[in-house]
């Protein structure tokens, strides 16, 4: 949220954010998007790009015009394409593993899933 707020302040535009409800992103808190309003999507980290794509889809479904994605850390390895420009401050190449190939899984070590999408 902080990244988006500061981006909006620098661009002198409205800052809003989407909430997750029943596995879908929605606008709450009185936020609205005007038809044709240009929207820049901000995120802290992108690995597969699912949340960013959901946000772009939400903006379009509400009549907005997503024009760019700004992220702090790009972990995608260049494997995401949102159809609009993507800008990042850092590009990191970190290994990711399928569960069958994960060395920690093979050693029987428990895994945790950090982040805002984790369910407790």
PLM feature spans:
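Surface-exposed beta-strand edges and their flanking turn/coil or helix-capping segments
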Residues: 30, 41, 99-103
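A contiguous pocket-lining binding segment that forms or flanks enzyme active sites
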Residues: 32-71
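PRPP-dependent phosphoribosyltransferase catalytic core
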Residues: 56-120
